[in-house]
């Protein structure tokens, strides 16, 4: 038989709906299984005003329970005819008396046991408690009590519709009784009786409620597209579409307009006002320029001039505020804002944003020299100085436009006559803001972005603010990933150790370090290494290749990536496979030996002498290849040793009876192994 359960309530926040339905479904399925009630499937529907659950083919009876619980052995359960603690524990666990115990025999001996048989009950007798529990156990990010009730829910509950096989499942929670009645749209529907799931689905639609979330979303998308002229497009992102879908029971799209005067303000400001503050969809032309139009999705079934005018009025007030803040900000020089950063706390132990900017300037100056951008030093340091200036602007500071940090800084900088690269760098130093985001394109934004992130990362580690499990209040994992991705994208030749050290120097000058400097350095570098592993893994490189390279040296990200690429390309070659076989064999013989003392007078065979001469020649060649960053050539040089090493193993017994000869041969192989491991631990490759 089919089951229908609807929790009717005052409108809950849109962000609560999907999780509430997911929890309702999983909890119901769990309870049916725990109660031995078979069912075919469970599906959910939802609007801000109702959570709906439908279950198909729910069995009319519980299954009988016939189980045997085996406890400890008879020997452990009894001593001198009396129960031991083990025996008493078995009784307690099963809530039974000693008389209910049986002794059973199996291949392992005699054991105490308890046989239980429970006759299944009618499902309709069990469902009331199950449905009550579903309501009482439903949790939300925030919940409330109302009236004199003790129950907590996202919003006050108004009704329960509960049917099983067409009959009402009777239950009550603090005066709210279940029934066969539901309610339609708050303004365009009425109360109605329900006799079945099919009947409910028909009547709920007749009462202007679209309970299927995916159907509502599709309707909204179609309505938006149908509202556009040929040369227009709407700014529709998934998050806003999902939110609006969960704000209405029946969508209807209305096109509104606003004064063209507001287009003087950067369109990103207007778009934020519409999307974030009002949940409207902005309309743009095909080139991406904002038009003085928007789409609002009303919770209704038809056009309303009053709704249109009301939304236009609200938006105009919003945009007027934004325009006022914008022009007020243009009156204030950005340098003045830098001074105001002294009043904004970055982190309680690390000082203000102003302190942070000063540290970033020192890091940036180091990077300018290291990366040989001295000819752009003035613009780069100017970018770093102004990077956070917009945080204290009217537009950003407590004015609900925080998403525009960086963008507004760029705009104000351009209006103030700053260099284009400086302005762009102010915006781009925040890139990437999330996974898959843009990366800074100019060196100003690249250096400002790295300086900002390494100061945050090292600073937080330096005062003991370190991510643990799911807790990462300063988003340090994302910060470290940003450093790694910026360096890779810009192909920067830089030592992470040097970068961390210069950041530590700046923190020490500010006298804010609370943790041992050496420990901070080690911990930060390990943290960065793990992020490098993550990024390389996302790039689809083999884990063993990544670790072979990074366990050898993770200090220079671009160098490490180049080596990973070369090894990956070489792995498909027969020469590389032959080299790896030799590496494994040499590694097994060495067994961790580090001594490379070699005495030529102890060579007893010509092949030992030949291998030594060839390896000395290859050593100088591979060192030159590494110096020139020709890593493919490095491996080509190693390949030349393989035939000689193979011949060596065919004719030489390394474990000679003479200890001096044996040690000399192991030393020679250790020397060769060092050649193999100059840029990666090849013996770690599968």
Curated annotation (Swiss-Prot):
Species: Fusobacterium nucleatum subsp. nucleatum (strain ATCC 25586 / DSM 15643 / BCRC 10681 / CIP 101130 / JCM 8532 / KCTC 2640 / LMG 13131 / VPI 4355)
Catalysed transformations (reactions): tRNA(Gly) + glycine + ATP = glycyl-tRNA(Gly) + AMP + diphosphate
Location within or outside the cell: Cytoplasm
One Pfam family, short name: DALR_1
PROSITE patterns: AA_TRNA_LIGASE_II_GLYAB
NCBIfam families: glyS
Organism taxonomic ancestry: Bacteria, Fusobacteriati, Fusobacteriota, Fusobacteriia, Fusobacteriales
Entry EC number(s): 6.1.1.14
Record carries keyword Cell division: no
Example GO biological process: glycyl-tRNA aminoacylation
The protein's name in its UniProt record: Glycine--tRNA ligase beta subunit
The family this protein is said to belong to: Belongs to the class-II aminoacyl-tRNA synthetase family.
Matches recorded under InterPro entries: DALR_anticod-bd, Gly-tRNA-synth_bsu, Gly-tRNA-synth_heterodimer
Any one GO cellular component localisation term in the record: cytosol
Major subcellular site: cytoplasm
Keywords: Aminoacyl-tRNA synthetase, ATP-binding, Cytoplasm, Ligase, Nucleotide-binding, Protein biosynthesis
Description of how the protein assembles with itself and partners: Tetramer of two alpha and two beta subunits.
Domain of life (superkingdom): Bacteria
Entry GO MF terms: arginine-tRNA ligase activity; ATP binding; glycine-tRNA ligase activity
């Amino acid at each position: 038989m089919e089951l229908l359960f609807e929790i009717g309530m005052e409108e809950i926040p849109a962000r609560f709906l999907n999780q509430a339905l997911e929890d309702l479904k999983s909890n119901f399925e769990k309870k049916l299984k725990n109660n031995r009630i078979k069912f075919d499937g469970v599906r959910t529907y939802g609007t801000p005003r109702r959570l709906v659950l439908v279950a198909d083919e729910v069995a009319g009876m519980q299954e009988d329970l016939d189980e045997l619980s085996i406890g400890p052995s008879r020997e452990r359960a009894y001593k001198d005819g009396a129960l031991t603690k083990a025996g008493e524990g078995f009784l307690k666990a099963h809530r039974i008396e000693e008389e209910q115990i049986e002794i059973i025999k199996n291949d392992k001996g005699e054991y105490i046991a308890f046989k239980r048989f429970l006759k299944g009950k009618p499902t309709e007798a069990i469902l009331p408690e199950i449905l009550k529990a579903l309501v009482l156990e439903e949790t939300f990010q925030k919940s409330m009590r109302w009236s004199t009730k003790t129950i907590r829910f996202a919003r006050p509950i108004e009704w329960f519709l509960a049917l099983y096989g067409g009959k009402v499942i009777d239950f009550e929670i603090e005066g709210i009784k279940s029934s066969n009645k539901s309610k339609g749209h708050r303004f365009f529907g009425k109360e109605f009786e329900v006799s079945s799931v099919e009947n409910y689905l028909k009547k709920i639609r007749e009462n202007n409620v679209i309970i299927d979330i995916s159907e509502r979303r599709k309707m909204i998308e179609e309505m938006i597209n149908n509202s556009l002229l040929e040369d227009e497009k709407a700014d529709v992102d998934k998050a806003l579409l999902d939110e609006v879908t969960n704000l209405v029971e029946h969508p209807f799209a209305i096109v509104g307009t606003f004064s063209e005067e507001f287009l003087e303000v950067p369109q990103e400001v207007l778009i934020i006002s519409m999307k974030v503050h009002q949940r409207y969809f902005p309309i743009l032309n095909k080139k991406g320029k904002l038009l003085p139009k928007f789409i609002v999705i009303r919770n209704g079934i038809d056009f309303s001039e009053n709704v249109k005018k009301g939304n236009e009025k609200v938006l105009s007030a919003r945009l007027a505020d934004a325009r006022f803040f914008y022009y007020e900000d243009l009156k204030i020089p950005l340098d003045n804002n830098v001074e105001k950063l002294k009043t904004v706390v970055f982190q309680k132990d690390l000082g203000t944003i102003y302190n942070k900017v000063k540290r970033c300037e020192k890091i940036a100056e180091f990077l300018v020299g290291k990366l040989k951008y001295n000819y752009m030093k003035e613009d780069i340091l100017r970018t770093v100085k102004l990077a956070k200036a917009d945080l204290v602007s009217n537009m950003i500071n407590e004015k609900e436009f925080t998403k525009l940090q960086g963008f507004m800084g760029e705009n104000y900088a351009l209006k103030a006559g700053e260099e284009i690269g400086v302005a762009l760098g102010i915006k781009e130093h925040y890139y990437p803001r999330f996974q898959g985001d843009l990366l800074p394109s100019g060196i100003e934004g690249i250096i400002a972005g790295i300086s900002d992130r390494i100061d945050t990362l090292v600073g937080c580690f330096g005062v003991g603010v370190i991510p643990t499990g799911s807790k990462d209040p300063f988003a340090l994992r994302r910060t470290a990933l940003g450093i790694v991705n910026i360096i890779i994208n810009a192909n920067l030749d830089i030592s992470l150790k040097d970068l961390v050290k210069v950041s530590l120097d700046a923190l020490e000058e500010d006298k804010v370090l609370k943790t041992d400097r050496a420990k901070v350095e080690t911990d930060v570098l390990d943290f960065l290494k793990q992020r490098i592993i993550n990024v390389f893994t996302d790039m689809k490189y083999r884990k063993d290749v990544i670790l072979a390279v990074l366990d050898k040296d993770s200090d220079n990200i671009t160098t490490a990536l180049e080596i990973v690429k070369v090894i990956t390309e070489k792995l498909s070659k027969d020469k590389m496979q032959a080299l790896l076989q030799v590496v494994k064999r040499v590694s097994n013989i060495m067994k961790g030996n580090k001594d490379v003392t070699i005495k030529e007078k102890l060579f007893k065979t010509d092949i030992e002498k030949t291998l030594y001469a060839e390896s000395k020649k290859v050593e100088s060649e591979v060192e030159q290849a590494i110096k020139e960053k020709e890593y493919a050539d490095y491996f080509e040089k190693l390949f030349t040793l393989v035939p000689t090493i193979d011949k060596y193993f065919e004719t030489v017994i390394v474990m000679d009876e003479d200890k001096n000869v044996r040690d000399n041969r192991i030393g020679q192989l250790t020397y060769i192994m060092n050649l193999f491991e100059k840029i990666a631990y090849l013996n770690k490759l599968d």
